A protein has these predicted regions:
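OB-fold and OB-like single-stranded nucleic-acid-recognition modules
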Residues: 4-141
Length: 141
């Protein structure tokens, strides 16, 4: 009985330290949360009016190209009309491309898709950078 009390007395500070460390770490570490889908849902033809805004942009992929010879190894999904006359583009940079289970230029070509993200302008063409496949949802035509 006396030995048990000694062990309990010795273990109490260790248990208290573990509890305190757990509480501190629960405040420091927060799993990455997925932002809620934006309220703004538009077509590719409306995207130019919403530069800088977070939106869901929907349309049909008219052309799709993986260009490994360009710096950053981009994949371009072009909407409205084929490149170079596209009205909207989704760009997937090489560093993000490995996250897709199949080549995006093959998977999405001629598909109606919706992409979620912040609309930027690149050389006058609105675009969204897709970093993860979850940003792109295939739609039924």
């Amino acid at each position: 009985m006396k030995n048990l009390r000694k062990w309990i007395v010795r273990l109490m500070p260790v248990i208290a330290l573990i509890i305190v460390a757990g509480l501190i770490l629960s405040r420091v570490y927060r799993p990455e949360s997925t932002p809620a889908e934006p309220d703004l849902r538009i077509t590719v033809h409306e995207a130019a009016e919403h530069i800088g805004e977070r939106a869901v942009v929907c349309g049909i992929v008219e052309s799709a190209d993986f260009v490994p010879s360009v710096g950053g190894e981009p994949t371009f999904l072009n909407f409205g009309r084929p490149h170079p006359d596209q009205v909207f583009t989704v760009v997937i940079w090489g560093e993000d491309r490995a996250r897709w289970p199949a080549p995006p230029e093959e998977r999405y070509l001629t598909q109606r898709i919706c992409v979620t993200g912040t609309i930027q302008s690149h050389q006058g063409v609105p675009q969204i950078r897709a970093r993860v496949p979850q940003q792109i949802k295939a739609q039924q035509i």
